[in-house]
Amino acid sequence: MSNIHEHKILILDFGSQYTQLIARRIREIGVYCELWAWDVSEEQIRGFAPNGIILAGGPESVTADNSPRAPEYVFNAGVPVLGICYGMQTMSEQLGGKVIQGVGEGEFGYAQVEVQTESALFKAIEDAVSETGKPLLDVWMSHGDKVSEIPDGFVTVANTETCPFAAMANEDKKFYGVQFHPEVTHTRQGKRMLEHFALDICGCDANWKPSSIIEDAVERLKKQIGDDEVILGLSGGVDSSVVAMLLHRAIGDKLTCVFVDNGLLRLNEAQQVMDMFGDHFGLNIIHVDAENRFLDAMAGEADPESKRKIIGHVFVEIFDEESKKCANAKWLAQGTIYPDVIESAGSATGKAHVIKSHHNVGGLPDDMELGLVEPLRELFKDEVRKIGLELGLPYDMLYRHPFPGPGLGVRVLGEVKKEYCDLLRLADAIFIEELHKADLYNKVSQAFTVFLPVRSVGVMGDGRKYDWVVSLRAVETIDFMTAHWAHLPYDFLGRVSNRIINEIDGISRVVYDISGKPPATIEWE
């Protein structure tokens, strides 16, 4: 079995919104990489022993006092280094070049760079050819400051009309800098540039692929767990489902899954989970029907943050009770993924505001004396999905839209009641069914229905009735950090509205949410 961690790239994060995208692109190429904060020590870098280092972008100005710098060891480690945007600027400044502050002449968005000098980074890459016969590349820029003087030993590789050093290289030391962002899809040849860096310049093998990751994970799980038993909270979501399948492959029936039906799931979801994992895949599952317990705990509570905390607390209580029945279990499995690990490391800086409490944070009881098994903690979400497919999980389940941990608890606005959840489940199922029928489901990033605790007058036949209102929500987004409302066709929205009002007794009005993020969040609570 090849060692999937033998060849690796270290990415240093200076705060760019694109940094995780760089890591995902390197992984897609087939090379393992990790994302660390910029202020790491020489000892940590030596311990990781990367084959190459990428200095990512960031929002700061290299010209400002106390702005971040790469550790000096980066340039003495004897491995190739690629600086992207801010990473190029700090590389230039730290190695003796100069950076000037942009005054009204930054480049933001599409640009075309002209390649002046051959470079291993741009080998056999071009989008067009200039009048003078030089390669042109379509790229994505996002910078105010720029390099005004490159360090000794470097050559200018590419430029634009306003940026004299759009790319630079010291081929002897294998140091490269690009002012644009090769990791975003708008840079058409960006993936090939990153391939040149990771595979050709750094000499990495492309061993990081789903089948190898599964093989490696199964071996590591067997070694970690031995003959012990493991319990897992199975929600039916992507992460816990893939953890269940990996553990089942590694340790078979030594895995016990606890599936807690909190009454806040989608239509028929509990039955689907039991059918797939219990009947089809043959996993040991304890099914806990806890609808009343969750609803009773939330009775009278309208505050979204409090509802989230109650849902989390009741889940922990139930899971704790069930785990004590599994007396032989020595390990607790969790679906922690790599962005959770990055977020936890990053949150230590204390710079981010709390927008919403994350339903996985807050944890299980301190007195739960179980070891932790986290087989997905190195993986991004797209990698988890690919592994799920390889393990035999259905595509529709792995690629369905995100569903919040508290479920309908945060899609029923205000107090949560069984009547509201039942109506919402039916309305949401119609919306999703119609999206699939119209071939629109995969064209939006997330779609769902929200229950509004207001009654609205409706006309049915000759009579009037006061019934509930639901809102349809559909958004388009790349990263869920920002989102546009989806411009669904009017006739489609009309069809969904008619079906909901005519087929569900208790709903008299359907509205469509046309708020973007920001200022609104994607979920209503």
Curated annotation (Swiss-Prot):
Active site annotation, chain numbering: 85, 181, 183
Residues reported to bind ATP: 235-241
Pathway named in the protein's UniProt entry: Purine metabolism; GMP biosynthesis; GMP from XMP (L-Gln route): step 1/1
Enzyme Commission no: 6.3.5.2
Record-annotated Glutamine amidotransferase type-1 domain positions: 8-207
Record's catalysed reaction(s): XMP + L-glutamine + ATP + H2O = GMP + L-glutamate + AMP + diphosphate + 2 H(+)
Record keywords, A-Z: ATP-binding, Glutamine amidotransferase, GMP biosynthesis, Ligase, Nucleotide-binding, Purine biosynthesis
Domain of life of the source: Bacteria
Gene Ontology terms for molecular function: ATP binding; GMP synthase activity
GO cellular component: cytosol
Enzyme class, broadest EC rank: ligase
Sequence ranges assigned to domain GMPS ATP-PPase in this UniProt record: 208-400
Function: Catalyzes the synthesis of GMP from XMP.
Quaternary assembly: Homodimer.
Protein name according to UniProt: GMP synthase [glutamine-hydrolyzing]
